[in-house]
Amino acid sequence: MKDAERIPGPKPLPVVGNLFDIDPEHSLESIVAFAEKFGPLFQITINGEKQIFATSQALVDELCDELRFHKAVVTGLEILRLLAHDGLFTAYHGERGWGIAHRILVPAFGPLRIRNMLDDMSDVAQQLCLKWARQGGSTSINITEDFTRLTLDTIALCTMGFRLNSFYNNETMHPFVQSMLYVLREADIQANLPGIANSIRVSAQRRMHKNIEAMRTMARGIIQERRKNKNPVDDILNTLLNGRDPVTGEGMSDDSIIDNVITFLIAGHETTSGLLSFTFYFLIQHPHILKKAQEEVDETVGLAQISAQHLAELPYIDAILKESLRLMPTAPGFTVTPKKTEVLGGRWMINAGQPVNVLLPACLRDQSVFGPDADEFRPERMLAENFSKLPPNSWKPFGNGERGCIGRAFAWQEAQLVVAMILQTFDLVPDDPSYQLRIKETLTIKPDGFRIRATLRRGQTATGLSRRSMLVARDGSSEESSNHPAEARGDHAPARGQPVSFFYGSNSGTCKALAHQLASNMMSRGYTTQKLAPLDNAVDNLPRDQPVIILTTTYDGQPTDNAKKFVAWLETGNVLSLQGISYAVFGCGHHDWTQTFYRIPILIDDLMYKAGATRLAPRGAANAAVSDLFSDLEAWEETSLLPALRENFLPSNSTDFDPLNPHQIQLSLSKPRRVDLHKGLIEAKVTAVRVLTSPDTPEKRHLEFCFQGDLSLRPGDHLNILPVNPPSTVSRVLAQFNLAPDYNITVNSFNTLGLPQATPVSASELFSSYVELCQPATRNNLKSLIAATQSDTVKQELNRLYDSYEFIVRDKRVSVLDLLEQFPSISLPIAAFISMLPALRVRTYSLSMAPAFKPSHSSLTFSVINEPAWRGSGQHLGVASNYLASLTSGSIFYFSPRPAKETFHLPKDPSRTPIIMICAGSGLAPFLSFIQDRMVLKQQNKPLAKAFLFFGCRGRSLDDLYHEELSEYEAAGVVEVRRAYSKTPEFDIAKGCRYVQHRLVTEGQAILSLWAQNAIIYVCGSTSMAKGAEAVLQNMLGPLPKERYVTEIF
C-alpha cells in the first residue's frame, strides 16, 4: 500500500485552531464551504481536537460498514448526555443500558404498531388544519413553530397517550420546547468553545442544568401519571415501563425510562418539524411541483379521511419528502469511528477511536451520484424506479445501521400524512415572496423566519372543516368516502338491477349497520345499491330516478351528527320541490325517551312529504327497548318496502328469494395448499377427545377420529400426521421480523422445497404450515448468522457455539429463531431466515385403536410436550403433540397410513403364540390396538393364547391410562395387566414396583413359562425403559432373537 496521504483542511491557528474560520451563528454553512474547497475528506481543529469530515458517497459507503466502524458520541451530542445519558440517541457504543432499551423498543416500532398510530396522528394534524382554517388566508403563519407544535403533540400522544395541547396556546411554545431549544442551542455553543471559555460561562451552565431538570421533571410526571392508570393502553410508554429484554430478561430502570422518554420527545419531533418546514419551503418555491403534488392527493384521496392505504398510493409525496431531506437533512450528520486503524478511500489513515463526521448536506449533493443538478429540488429523482438505482448508502438522513433512527417509520408516516392533509385542504403562498432561505442551527437545522399564508381550497369553510373532522372522529371514517356507489368501493358484489340509494343518520353505528344490511338484502332481490352514505351527503343531492331509503334515529332529541345538515336543509323551507323523489323512512328509537321517541324519523318523513316527495311505504319503526332492530327491519322490508318497490320500481330478472342463501353467495371449497405438498394425505374428522391424566401430571390425551375408505391398517401400524406449528412459536417469528399475521409473503425460488411457489401466502400461514421453526440450527446456519452481525461480541459468542456445536446447539435443540432472539443485533433478512428452515415434516404416531374394533375409525394416544427448553430458557413445545391437543370434536386434520415393520404386528396364529407387551406412558398406544384386536377375536369365539401387558406410569390417580378399559379386557380374558407405579409403588396393584423392569422380575416365572411356549415380546417406549427391560430379560431368558424380541423406541 502506498503511504497514506495527509488529510487536507484549513490551517489552524495556535490554541484556537480553526475557531475563527467558523461563523458561530452558521457553523454548518461554514463547514460545508470547507467541503467545496478541500474535497471529499478534510479536517479542522476545534478546541485542540481534530475533527474529520467526509463529504462524498464513496467515503460514506465505507464509513457505513459496521464491520469496520461504529457510532461515536462526540461534541454537542456528548454534551447532551447530561440530559439523556445512555438513551437511544446519546449512548456510547456498546453501552449496556442502550442494548436493553433497544432490544425492548425495536419491536414496538414495527410497521403494524406504526400503522395503528395513524388515527392519533390524524387527530393532531386536524388540529393544525383547523387552526390555519380559522385564522384565515390573510394571516401570516410561522410554519416552523406550528410544525414544532404538531410534531411534539403527535409524538406525545402516539407513544405515551399524553396530550400537550400545544395548539391551544398560540402565544408561547410548550415549556418543554422552550427548555429543549435552549439545551440544544447551548450544547451546540459549548461544543464550539474551548473548555476554559465554557468554564467561565457560569450563568449559562446554571441555566443549562435548570432546563435539563425541567425536562426530566416533565418526563417523570408523564411516567408517574401512567403508573396511576390501572388500565394502560398498549403504547410505547407501556413498553418502556413493562417491557423485558429478551436477552437479559431485565426491564428498564426508571432513569433509563426517563432518558428515553426525553429522547423520544426531542428526536421524535425536532427533526420531523424541520423536514416538514423545508418541504413546504421547497414546494412554495416550485409551484409546478406543488400543483403536481396537490393533484396526486386529489386523485388518490379526494376529500376522504386519509388512510394508511392512501399513504401507500402517494409516490410523488414520498419522493418530495425524500428530496427535501436530501437537500436539507434536518439532522445534518452522524459520527463514526473505526474499530481499528483504517485507510479510508485508499488514501487517508484514520486511527482507531478517531471520530469521522459524515457531513450529510455535502454527501447528499454529491454530483457523481445525483448529477450536475444535485443542488436543485427535483423530486422525480427520488421516485421508486430512480431511488432504487442509487449507489449504496447514497441517502442516509436517518443515520446508519443499528444506531440508525429507531423511529424512522413513525416520522415518515407522520410527514406523509401532514403533507397530504395540508395539500388536501389548503392553497399555499409565501407570506414574503422575496424571502431568501436562512438556516437556524442548533444540533438540528430548520428554516429561519419562513412564513406562509394558507387559504382553504374548493370553497371549504372552517366550520365545514371542523364538522368533517368531528364526523371522522366519531365514525372512524370519512363521510365523503362513502359517496361513491357501493359497488365501486367493493362493499357489495356488483349487480345490474334497479338502483336504490340508502342514506343513514348514525352516531353509534347502529343505523349505519342497518343500512348496510338492508342494502345487502335488496341486492338479493335484484336491486343495485347506487349510494350508501350519511344523510348529510343527501343535501341537494337526492336522486329522482331511483327510490331513496332513509334509516335514522334521534340523539338527545336532535339529528345525529351526520344528519344535522340534512335536517336543517329540510327545516329551512328553502328546499326546492322534492317532487319526483320517491322515498321511505325507517326509524329507530327507545321508548324511555318519551319526549323524543322517533322525533327525527317522523320529522324527516313529514318534511319530505310536504316538500312534494312521494312516500313509497309507511314509515318503519324499531323500538330498541323491546325488540331486535334487525328483525324489525326485516319485517318492514317484507311487509311494506318490498311490495311498494315491486309496484313502482321493478327489479332486474332475479330468481325467487332463497331464505337459506338470501344473498345468492357462490363459493367453492378446496383443501389447504399445504396438503397438496404431501402425497397420500387423507382427511379425518375428530369425533372425541379426552385428557387421560390428572392436572398436575404431564398431559396425555386420547383423540378419536373417523375417515372414509378402507386403509388396510393393522394393529401396530402408524399414522403420519401433518401438523402446524404452535401459535406462540409463530408469534415469536412475526414479532422478530415485525410482521402482522396477515402480511402476504410470496416465495420465488427454485431452491426452496416445501413452500408454495410464486403464490402469496399470509405470514401466519407460511410460518404455521410450511416450515420447521424449532429445528436445531445447523453449522451453516451459524456461519450465516456470524456474517449477519456487526457486533464483535456476538461474533465471538456465535463462534463459541460453532466450536461446541454438538453439545450447545444440536443436543440442546437451539433453533435459528432462538439465536435471533438471543442476539438481537443479528440483522438477518427474512428471506435468509426462510431459506434456513426445512420444510415442515409429518410426525409419526402409533395407532391406539384396532381397525377391526371400530371400522372407519381410529385413535391416537399421545403425550403433550410442553416442558422447559433444554437451552435453559423458555419452553419447548412439541409441534405435533400441541397441534393435536388443540383439536376439538369436529376438527379436521390430515394423515397418511404408514405400516409398522413386519415383526411389530400380532402373531399370525394368535391362538398358539403368547405375547408379552412391555411399555410405559403413551407407549401403551400400539398395545391397546393389539388388545382390542384380540377382543374382537374373543367376541368371535376364537381361541387366544396368553397375553401379558407390563405397563409403567406414575400412579393410579395420576396417569394410569385407560384403566377402566383395560380392566374390562382383563375381565374378558383377553389380557393380564401388570402395573408399576413410579410415584406410588405401595399400591397393591403395583406390588411395590416403581418401574416395569422391576415388575418383570416379580413375574419371572410367568415370563419363563410363556417364553417356553415361543412367546413374542414387544417393547414400546423410551430408550432408558427399553434398555432396563432388555437387561432384565437377557438375565432371565438369555439371548433374545430378533424375531421374538421386537422393539419400537421413541
UniProtKB/Swiss-Prot annotation:
It is an enzyme of class 1 (oxidoreductase). Residues 500-641 form the Flavodoxin-like domain. Residues 679-907 form the FAD-binding FR-type domain. Residues 461-495 are annotated as: Disordered. InterPro entries: Bifunctional_P450_P450_red, CysJ-like_FAD-binding, Cyt_P450, Cyt_P450_CS, Cyt_P450_E_grp-I, Cyt_P450_sf, FAD-bd_FR_type, Flavodoxin/NO_synth. Binds 1 FAD. Keywords: Electron transport, FAD, Flavoprotein, FMN, Heme, Iron, Metal-binding, Monooxygenase, NADP, Oxidoreductase, Transport. It catalyses: 2 oxidized [cytochrome P450] + NADPH = 2 reduced [cytochrome P450] + NADP(+) + H(+); an organic molecule + reduced [NADPH--hemoprotein reductase] + O2 = an alcohol + oxidized [NADPH--hemoprotein reductase] + H2O + H(+); dodecanoate + reduced [NADPH--hemoprotein reductase] + O2 = 5-hydroxydodecanoate + oxidized [NADPH--hemoprotein reductase] + H2O + H(+); tetradecanoate + reduced [NADPH--hemoprotein reductase] + O2 = 7-hydroxytetradecanoate + oxidized [NADPH--hemoprotein reductase] + H2O + H(+). Its EC number is 1.14.14.1, 1.6.2.4. SUPFAM superfamilies: Cytochrome P450 (SSF48264), Ferredoxin reductase-like, C-terminal NADP-linked domain (SSF52343), Flavoproteins (SSF52218), Riboflavin synthase domain-like (SSF63380). FMN binds at residues 506-510, 585-617. Heme binds at C405. Its cofactor is FAD; FMN; heme. One of its GO terms (cellular component) is cytosol. The keyword Cytoplasm does not apply. GO terms for molecular function: aromatase activity; flavin adenine dinucleotide binding; FMN binding; heme binding; iron ion binding; NADPH-hemoprotein reductase activity. It comes from the Eukaryota. Pfam families: FAD_binding_1 (PF00667), Flavodoxin_1 (PF00258), NAD_binding_1 (PF00175), p450 (PF00067). In the N-terminal section; belongs to the cytochrome P450 family. Self-sufficient cytochrome P450 monooxygenase that catalyzes the regioselective in-chain hydroxylation of alkanes, fatty alcohols, and fatty acids at the omega-7 position. Performs hydroxylation of C10-C16 n-alkanes and C12 and C14 fatty alcohols; and thereby enables the one step biocatalytic synthesis of rare alcohols such as 5-dodecanol and 7-tetradecanol. Converts 1-dodecanol into 1,5-dodecanediol as major product with very little sub-terminally hydroxylated products with the 1,4-dodecanediol and 1,6-dodecanediol more abundant. This is Self-sufficient cytochrome P450 monooxygenase CYP505E5.
